[in-house]
């Protein structure tokens, strides 16, 4: 997939070389500059930005050019539900200042938490073998990297986290959300709450069967095209 998609060429050198060194200090990168250019380009409606890792590039773009706040919608997978005892999670904890900026700056945000939300998107080797293996080069690739994640597949399932964001874009009914006041990410990586803050959308669950059904049907259609 990477070899056949020109946009990925040189990707390792395009992204930020470090996390935000301090709150309010961006990291210049080709990725951040590219996002700014795309956001400010003429179009109807907002640009949907889907970071599925730490928020460094998006936060840097916002700090470098705050005008993009009015031109984008961020759909971010990271952290935990706003009522969870801890906000800490891999994507969020890598760059806390960048994560905090997403919730503080007022950018339109669809927050997809990991625990008990994206976490529902589990599949198994038998299901992948039945519905991905043999469905063209992409299906075989997905099956092989899934099986290669670990050697012991007994009583095992794995979360496919990243498809939660695209699922919301495809059909928001698959990833229900509600409006809530943007939480405050504390220095201890917990959530604090203030009802005077702006609103964000928080996802509350994922319709696992609908999302995987859509994925598997599209793999089959692509393979037979």
Where are these regions (language model features)?
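Active-site histidine-anchored catalytic micro-motif
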Residues: 17-125, 207
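Generic structural signal for short, solvent-exposed loop/turn connectors between secondary structure elements
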Residues: 2-4, 80-87, 186-188
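Short, functional N-terminal and low-complexity linear motifs
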Residues: 1-5, 25-26, 65-69, 130-135, ...
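Conformational coupling and interaction surfaces
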Residues: 90-100, 105, 109-225
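Short amphipathic alpha-helical segments, especially helix-boundary/capping motifs
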Residues: 7-13, 31-37, 73-76, 139-143, ...
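Metal-dependent C-N hydrolase catalytic cores
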Residues: 1-42, 198-206, 210, 216-220, ...
């Amino acid at each position: 997939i990477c070899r056949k998609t020109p946009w990925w060429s040189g990707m390792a050198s395009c992204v930020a070389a470090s996390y935000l060194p301090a709150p309010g200090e961006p990291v210049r990168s080709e990725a951040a500059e590219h996002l700014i250019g795309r956001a400010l380009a003429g179009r109807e409606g907002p640009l949907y930005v889907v970071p599925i890792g730490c928020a460094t590039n998006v936060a840097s773009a916002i700090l470098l050019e705050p005008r993009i706040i009015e031109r984008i919608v961020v759909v971010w997978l990271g952290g935990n539900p706003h009522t969870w005892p801890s906000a800490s999670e891999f994507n969020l904890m890598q760059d806390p200042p960048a994560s905090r900026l997403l919730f503080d700056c007022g950018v339109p945000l669809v927050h997809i938490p990991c625990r008990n939300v994206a976490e529902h998107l589990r599949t198994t080797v038998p299901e992948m073998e039945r519905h991905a293996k043999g469905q063209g080069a992409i299906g075989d690739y997905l099956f092989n990297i899934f099986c290669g994640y670990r050697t012991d597949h007994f009583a095992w399932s794995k979360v496919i986290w990243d498809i939660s964001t695209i699922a919301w874009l495809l059909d928001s009914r698959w990833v229900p959300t509600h409006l809530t006041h943007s939480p405050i990410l504390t220095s201890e990586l917990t959530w604090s709450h203030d009802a005077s803050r702006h609103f964000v959308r928080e996802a509350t669950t994922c319709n696992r069967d609908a999302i995987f059904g859509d994925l598997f049907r599209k793999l089959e259609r692509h393979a037979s095209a």
